[in-house]
């Protein structure tokens, strides 16, 4: 039985982009007779109040996309001790080191950058001696990075096809824990998906480039990776990427204007799952769902669809 998951970050109310990901995760799992679990990705508790998490649970139930468990959902903010064990495993093997670089140093014009604008860490702190680490620790708490190999990690995405990266060249040593002690997304998501028994992950294509480093972490930690399906991004009619700041596209406002079936039907139409924006239920869509129906390029919402 396939096990998918929702993994929302409760930094605001859900918008249509979040909903598209949840809908396709639900359809992908249910079309295989599977289940969908819920995990709340609230590592940064200052930005992720529980009230937003409660609203997400309510929104999903109202739409007919309620998770199959667990109850209550898994909260990443409750799992620091678990992440610490896996962090310590990598540290014991000499793969983790402290990084004292400031944000301005990391984003200096001379720093190598990816094509998407992300900084590739140059390894500035990788070779610090114990004495240098002790001296720098007097004035600045370090973040912690993991050292990646000069190795190509490739995989076949269930929707986007072949993707690969050379970790050293295209990714660089990445954060496992912030200076304030909060564990990084890259470590937490790998540990959680493995321990929850998730075997398929549906998420946005903005996370496609995170997958090689996560697959490497799965391997290094002796964990079984899921099958990945990366989605096109959902854009507003003017080409903007939807965000939680787009109040008019939030579920809070959409619930006041439409029924659940109307929202699902309009979104299914935008995703290529049906020929018109007629009202639909997730259960009806699951009976005919196939990944070949979903575009690979970004989806622009037709004007006045919502």
Model-derived features: positions:
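N-terminal Rossmann-like or analogous alpha/beta NTP/dinucleotide-binding catalytic cores
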Residues: 1-114, 205-206, 210-223
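Non-catalytic terminal extensions that flank enzyme cores
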Residues: 1-13, 31, 36, 134-135, ...
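Noncatalytic linker/hinge segments flanking ATPase motor cores
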Residues: 15, 77-83, 137-140, 186-191, ...
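Short, surface-exposed, polar/charged, turn-prone segments marking secondary-structure boundaries
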Residues: 32-33, 64-68, 102, 126-127, ...
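Active-site neighborhoods of enzyme catalytic cores
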Residues: 52-53, 57-163, 167, 278-306
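Active-site cores that bind ATP or allylic diphosphates and position pyrophosphate for catalysis
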Residues: 104-243, 250-254, 303-306
